[in-house]
C-alpha cells in the first residue's frame, strides 16, 4: 500500500524495549483536521505531549513517526508496548469518503500487525494484538487516560464494535469496479490495483486516469504523444465529431484531435491548425499560396462557390 513518508519524524524517544506487542487504533478527536495538518502538527509538536506513527485520511496514509519504538500514545503502561499507533481523521463529510479511509485504516492496522508478528485480534484479554485506545484506557497498568476512541467516531458512520472487530480479524473484501468519493471516480481491478496516469479500456470504452487514479471528465488532455484528447462528462474518450463549448472538433478512431484538412464521408472540412475547431463561413488559403478555398456555414468545402465582388472590394458568397 502507498504510504507517504514526507513528514516522517526521526529522533523521537524510544519508549520501553523490544519486542513491542501491540498496535494501537486511534481517531484524532478533531472534527476539522486533515491528514496533512495532523502530520504537520505532529512534525513540530513537543513529543512529550504525545506522538504516534501513522495518520489516515483524505484517501492517504502518512507515516509520521517510527514503528517498533514504543510511543506516548495511550497515556499509561502500554505506551511501552506500542509497535505502531494509527490515527484516523474525524473530518469526513460523506459516507463514501469515510469508507475509503476506513478501508485504508483497516488494511494498515492489519499490515502492521503482520509486520510485527502479532495476532490480528482486537481488544482481547491477550496482551498481544491490536488494541483500541478505549481498551487501553480501561485495561492498561498505570492508566492516566480517559480516551475512548475510535469507537464513537466509527459508530457515527455506522461501524459497530462488532463490525470493527470482524473487519480487523477478517479484513474487508476488496471493492472492485467503479468507485466514487468526493473527488471523483476511479476503477479498481480484481487484484485491488487501479490505473494512474494512463488510458484504460473498460467494457469497450476508453478512459483516462490522472496521476492520483481519478477518471478525467469534461476535460482536455494533452498526452505525451503530443496529441490532444477530450473526455466527456461520463469520462468517455471522444471519437469522431464532438461539439465542445459551441465549437465542433474531430477526433480520429484513436481519440486524437485532428487539425488541418479532414475528409469525412466524401466531404472535406478544415480544422483550425492550432485550436482544432472546425472552420466555417470562411476562406482558407491553399498550401502553395496560389488560391483560396471556401468553407460553407456548415463547415463543408464548397466545390463551386459563387462570389460577388462588391464595389468596395468586399467578397460575398451567394
From Swiss-Prot:
Residues 19-151 form the N-acetylmuramoyl-L-alanine amidase domain. One of its GO terms (cellular component) is extracellular region. Cell wall-binding repeats lie at residues 175-194, 196-215, 217-237, 238-257, 258-277, 280-301. Disulfide bonds: none annotated. One of its GO terms (biological process) is symbiont-mediated cytolysis of host cell. Keywords: Antimicrobial, Bacteriolytic enzyme, Cell wall biogenesis/degradation, Hydrolase, Repeat, Secreted. Its EC number is 3.5.1.28. It catalyses: Hydrolyzes the link between N-acetylmuramoyl residues and L-amino acid residues in certain cell-wall glycopeptides. InterPro entries: Amidase/PGRP_sf, Amidase_domain, Cell_wall/Cho-bd_repeat. It holds the Pfam family Choline_bind_1. One of its GO terms (molecular function) is N-acetylmuramoyl-L-alanine amidase activity. Its main location: secreted. Belongs to the N-acetylmuramoyl-L-alanine amidase 2 family. This is Lytic amidase.
